[in-house]
Amino acid sequence: MGAAPRLSAPRVLVLWAALGAAAHIGPAPDPEDWWSYKDNLQGNFVPGPPFWGLVNAAWSLCAVGKRQSPVDVDLKRVLYDPFLPPLRLSTGGEKLRGTLYNTGRHVSFLPAPRPVVNVSGGPLLYSHRLSELRLLFGARDGAGSEHQINHQGFSAEVQLIHFNQELYGNLSAATRGPNGLAILSLFVNVAGSSNPFLSRLLNRDTITRISYKNDAYFLQDLSLELLFPESFGFITYQGSLSTPPCSETVTWILIDRALNITSLQMHSLRLLSQNPPSQIFQSLSGNGRPLQPLAHRALRGNRDPRHPERRCRGPNYRLHVDDVPHGL
């Protein structure tokens, strides 16, 4: 996914012409939900990324923000921070359960209210509660992730979206405040083997239950810790939501060791439709925002970029799982 295009006068004129036409075609769209990754869906104009910041005043940061996401990570710019602690995952000793959902834009896993899953450590000063797992993927291998590393994309990107539960009562409030959100991203390649957690989400019996927009399927007995590599480093920076309203309140944590899924699992993802069954098929693939300028933001990592050949060893390069029941 390339860099975000700059808005020009012709683009603005096209937008207002499309808005005028839309006003005469049917009921007005919900302004909080009227966006897409593509400007044209089934012949109807729906604002794509270049227009997000123009169609809704609450989304203005999408157009004028200075700390937007996703970004291309230049490893030469990553500052080694030996004082970054390891990431910690708290599950309360319970298996994860929740609903796998085709939103029409993403494959989304929404965890049940219990158990509460928290992440802390790394660059985070507070404990953050898991709100959603989101899967983005491309129409072709190597071009499905939102973030890139040294100008290289990946076939998919898993984003674990958390809100700061120590400062805010819910995701909506955290989206509007400082230090509100933390998103852990894991990159995905297509290979001969598959990550065990993703295999549960992408096996044939599960993924075919969410073939169309608004389809949902309940899953249980999931071990979230199996999503993470056995050892890994991470890179962190301050950014934004990569969907409207593009709030600049996100601490991004990019895991530097990619996961794998099989070509069959990726093919199954590309067969998911962003429309209900009554409408023409349009693949859910290509569901990512273009790259945004990094500008002068700092990139920090817990691995020394001067010695990339060194393997991740020791407790700082493993996910620390706290499985003690909450409240004990």
From Swiss-Prot:
- Name the Gene3D superfamilies for this protein: Alpha carbonic anhydrase
Q: Which residues are glycosylated?
A: N118
Entries under InterPro entries matching the protein: Alpha_CARP_X/XI, CA_dom, CA_dom_sf, Carbonic_anhydrase_a-class
The entry lists its GO molecular-function terms as:
hydro-lyase activity; zinc ion binding
Supply the alphabetized keyword list. Glycoprotein, Secreted, Signal
Its localization reads:
Secreted
Signal sequence: where? 1-23
Stretches for region Disordered: 300-328
Would you tell me the Gene Ontology cellular component terms? basolateral plasma membrane; extracellular region
Gene Ontology biological process terms, A to Z: one-carbon metabolic process
Domain Alpha-carbonic anhydrase intervals: 33-303
Q: Where is the composition biased (Basic and acidic residues)?
A: 319-328
Q: Which family does it belong to?
A: Belongs to the alpha-carbonic anhydrase family.
Q: Could you tell me which PANTHER family the record lists for this protein?
A: CARBONIC ANHYDRASE, CARBONIC ANHYDRASE-RELATED PROTEIN 11
Protein task: Does not have a catalytic activity.
The protein here is known as: Carbonic anhydrase-related protein 11
UniProt source species: Ovis aries
